[in-house]
Regions:
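Ribonuclease/tRNase effector modules and their secretory precursors
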Residues: 1-160
Length: 160
């Protein structure tokens, strides 16, 4: 599995992520679907995804590098789905999701990296992250709902 690398930081301010811009960026994915290579699951991007991704309780709690990582991961949603692993089913327990997740939820692990550049714009290292894709399961299919539990892993210096 190749880890998708975010080469360009669209959202680089760690203090005030412009989540409204992230939401607008994510709207380009609406109506598309992507295949999880490990399971051949087809995951669709519905119109509720951009808002949930940028306005969820999880997102609102994010600060610093993890907030920046989630904002920039919007650029590689397709690759994060493609490379997802460790699928597991979770029963829907929230009444508010009774209809839009009527058959429960799938959670998948995924990984991505952000290139960190030096002062002369050379890539210095990769900051690696793991995350969980939250996917609604309905009779109509699987729909990406959010990306949560983003955790930074050990950075990888580039070899000279």
């Amino acid at each position: 599995m190749l880890t998708p690398i975010i080469e360009k930081n669209f959202f680089f301010n760690k203090q005030n992520i412009p989540w409204n811009e992230v939401e607008i960026y994510l709207k380009q994915y609406i109506g598309q679907s992507f295949i999880v290579d490990a399971y051949q699951d087809e995951i669709f991007i519905a119109s509720d995804f951009p808002d949930e991704y940028s306005e969820s309780k999880y997102t609102k709690k994010l600060r610093g590098a993890v907030a920046k990582a989630k904002a920039n991961a919007a650029q590689i949603i397709d690759m994060m789905i493609k490379n997802a692993v460790n699928r597991r089913w979770v029963e829907n327990k929230a009444l508010k999701h009774k209809e839009n997740a009527s058959e429960g939820w799938y959670r998948y692990d995924t990984y991505f990296a952000i290139a960190v550049k030096g002062s002369n714009e050379d890539q210095v290292r990769l900051n690696r992250y793991r995350a969980t894709l939250v996917v609604r399961k309905t009779p109509k299919g699987l729909f990406l709902y959010d990306v949560v539990d983003i955790k930074k892993e050990a950075s990888t210096p580039l070899e000279s």
